[in-house]
């Protein structure tokens, strides 16, 4: 097997500075512009998060750090490698390229968006910002332990990774309310970014802006939703309670009896796979070098240079960059360990089915409004006229991509019960691994080394949050690459 070494670091020519937009609606997350506004916006809050990080204050709004110790450093990064070609990696590459960096996107598959970003539920859902770190989650997990068709399934076989993750999950329960509020803020910011990028690049992704309807079959679930709505409102999201009669008016095709619901008109749905692939093409138009079929074997950094060993069509090669951004989903934990950091993402499997609506009767009987059934934890999206996506469940079973019939069957049964006029003759099953942090907050920020960054761990909200965290990461890297010295907290490496 051949081994080749290649440098992707530009020469000694003057560094190309990060691009700054004159119009704040063109380039979101710019701290100075947002501070000029008399009324704080969500983007200003994200910018304030970045300001707090540069001053060594505790991180907020999803930017995670493990230490408040400071390191004064000055760096002029020109070339950056982004590891991972899913929605998070591609949006990150796009945000960095817009700021003038020389970006290489490294993806082990032949195309972008072939794993977790392939066939998710499709919801761009600020209304789903509630984190899972609630005591009821543990109760349900124990109750459903022996049910193979349960919405939440935990393999009881122990592993240190699983035990440490759940220990940190339990430790995060006191921050449930605060993290839910901050996730709602991030989600609202993200959709503004994403819509603007889609319009700027002419991306068509079966986007449907008809809101998301949460349905509840009993009083207990509905009353809990009312408490969640107050947290979402604190994060800036408006949604309204609806009666069973209003549920029928919002989505007439839905069968069954329901206690009540909550409707979020500002939420929407779309095809994550199509969006990610088209944005990857937009990245290439901006000069991003998208290298597919490249499996990252190892990565290391000395603080000023990052070296990445790859296995691809040309054999084993080594490439060097000024910096690296890890957006590798469930693979981020292993890469972080090589870089001296701890990113405790756990793979939580979710399933989906795509129902092909082959006849006019099925197309009429399928819903157009996106749904979330609280009892079954299933979500839906109508993708164009001829596809109906149903997704959900959470399975803690390690790195396991098997598509199990006993996990797919409840999704098909749910369609037949709630939409009896939809033919399930042609159904495409799928399973993907969500990269989840124990506190349900994405890892966005610096690593131990000055030129190492992370944007990963978005869990079930990767599609929803990706554009905001990518833009925030772009701001952080741009600040690091500025000619003047800046003060940034160094993320302490955990044992």
Map each language-model feature to its residues:
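C-terminal catalytic lobe of FAD-dependent flavoproteins
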Residues: 375, 417-495
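Active-site substrate-recognition segment that forms the wall
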Residues: 120-123, 128, 132-170, 298-305, ...
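Helical element adjacent to the flavin cofactor pocket in flavoenzyme catalytic cores
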Residues: 223, 227-235, 257-315
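Short beta-strand to alpha-helix junction loop
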Residues: 178-188, 214-224, 249, 262-281, ...
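N-terminal Rossmann-like FAD-binding beta1-loop-alpha1 element of flavoenzymes
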Residues: 78-105
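Glycine-rich FAD pyrophosphate-binding loop
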Residues: 98-118
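Dinucleotide-binding Rossmann-like beta1-alpha1 core, especially the glycine-rich loop
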Residues: 119-243
